Structure formats: C-alpha cells, structure tokens
Amino acid sequence: MAISKLHLLFLLSVFLSLHPLVLSDTADEEDVLLTGINSYRASLNLTTLIHNHNAECLADEIADQFKNQPCTNTTGSASVPGTTPGFPNLPNLLSKCRLNPTVTRDGAILPACVPNLDPSLVLTNFTMSQYSKDLNDSKFTGIGIGSDDNWIVVVLTTSTPEGSYSPASNSGAFAFGVNGLVSSSLMFLLFCFFMF
C-alpha cells in the first residue's frame, strides 16, 4: 500500500513539473486567442501555428511596453498602416529574450488594444483587420502571445533562419541546457528512488 502511494506521489510530481499551473486570467486569454487563430487558419486550410517560447517572451515584453498607452484609433490593429508607434527599444527587448535581430527579420509583430481583453473582440481584432494578411500567410509557422492590461501582442515566426526566433547561440543554448539537465536529472533520481 505504501509503495502505491509513493508511485502516486511520483506521478503527481511528474505531472505538476511537466504542466505548470495556470494562475492568471492572462494566460487563459492568450490560450483562447491561440485556439481562435488556429481555428481561423484551419478554416483557410492553413497549418496551425506552433507555440514559440522565444516569440512569447518578446510579445510579453512588447505588451509590457504598451500597457500604459491608451487605446485609440491610432494604436494596434485599428491604426492606419505605418502609423502604429514603432518599438524604439526593440534591441533591448530582444536582449531580454536572448534573441538576435537577425533571427526576427521575417517575423511579424502585431499589437492590439482591446478594452478588458474581451476574447471575441480580441480575435476579431486579428482576423478582421489589417493583421489578417499576416495570419493568412502560409510562411508563418509559429506564434507567441503576450498581454498586459488592455494590450495583447502576437508575434508570428517562420521556419526560416531569419524568422525562427531562435535564441542567441552564446547565451540561450547554455541556459536551456543547464535547466534541462537539472530537471532531467532530478526526475531520473526520483524515478530511481521510487522504483528500486
């Protein structure tokens, strides 16, 4: 009986370590938008977009930059092309996410401001606006979504080296390797402890 409880505890710890708990409404809004965008693309016979953690990091950073900016008809998807404020500190934001500008050239950054981030309005802001051109483009294969306050940002990635949003080779790879090694080692040790 004690062994079965240990196995149950082990399985529970594996489940919790592999599936981080979602503790905020923001993640839910982002998940709803991702599902909506992928359904929209499926209706156009396009491939679904795959979650890209690096693009999500950049989307989060950009949304954070916009959070104190009010929604107007000159911001986000309602703006006239070319009038949306640029990202003057983009190099700093890329650095925070361990990204090199050369791996983001083919990507697209799509900010939208929607009061209270109403899910149906958020999806409409991407699928029924100037952003639909990017969502309809088959070159995009990945997506990262970030939000803060009334702002939600979608970053689209490609499978090309210039749009993959791969981390900079001198910093991101080591950090990923160390974290992956520690997690894998811990799980292996727990497995051995409970099985033998």
Swiss-Prot record:
- Topology class, membrane: Lipid-anchor; GPI-anchor
Q: Could you say which protein family the record assigns here?
A: Belongs to the UPF0277 family.
* Superkingdom of the source species: Eukaryota
Question: Which InterPro entries is this protein grouped with?
Answer: At5g19230-like (IPR045285)
Segment forming the signal sequence = 1-24
Supply the source organism's classification: Eukaryota, Viridiplantae, Streptophyta, Embryophyta, Tracheophyta
Where does lipidation (GPI-anchor amidated serine) occur on this chain?
S171
| Residues carrying a glycan | N45, N73, N125, N136
Q: Does the keyword Signal apply?
A: yes
The identity of this protein, by name, is: Uncharacterized GPI-anchored protein At5g19250
Question: What is the source species?
Answer: Arabidopsis thaliana (Mouse-ear cress)
Q: Where in the cell is it found?
A: Cell membrane
* Keywords, ordered alphabetically: Cell membrane, Glycoprotein, GPI-anchor, Lipoprotein, Membrane, Signal
Please give the residues making up the propeptide in this record: 172-196
Instruction: List GO terms (cellular component aspect).
Output: plasma membrane; plastid; side of membrane
